[in-house]
Amino acid sequence: MPKCPKCDKEVYFAERVTSLGKDWHRPCLKCEKCGKTLTSGGHAEHEGKPYCNHPCYSAMFGPKGFGRGGAESHTFK
């Protein structure tokens, strides 16, 4: 029986969500920063931990500076 990477308890088939190559309990698959409940495949990963794509992952690990990587973040010289 697989164990949830968050709570380390057994994950039964009826409550299983597979993401990041592991089986999670649905309530355990949350963003590490804001705590938002995530869906399988609807999030980003950093060092094996799930993060919501926006704003948490992009703010923490995306390009830094004004606009965080959007069209307005390029500086012309």
UniProtKB/Swiss-Prot annotation:
The family database entries (SUPFAM superfamilies) matched by this protein are listed as:
Glucocorticoid receptor-like (DNA-binding domain)
Q: What CDD domains is this protein classified in?
A: LIM_CRIP
**Its biological purpose:** Seems to have a role in zinc absorption and may function as an intracellular zinc transport protein.
Its name, as the record gives it, is: Cysteine-rich protein 1
- Report the GO terms under cellular component: cytoplasm
Looking at the Swiss-Prot or TrEMBL record, what is one Pfam family this protein matches? LIM
Tell me one GO biological process term: cellular response to UV-B
Q: Which residues carry this modification: N6-acetyllysine?
A: K9, K22
For the modification Omega-N-methylarginine, the affected residues are R68
Annotated source species: Rattus norvegicus (Rat)
Keyword annotations for this protein, in alphabetical order, are:
Acetylation, LIM domain, Metal-binding, Methylation, Zinc
Domain of life of the organism in this record? Eukaryota
One GO molecular function term of this record is:
zinc ion binding
- Asked if the record carries the keyword Transmembrane helix, the reply is no
All copies of domain LIM zinc-binding, residue ranges: 2-63
> Which gene is annotated as encoding this protein in its UniProt record?
Crip1
Report if keyword Plastid is assigned. no
Cite the source lineage. Answer: Eukaryota, Metazoa, Chordata, Craniata, Vertebrata
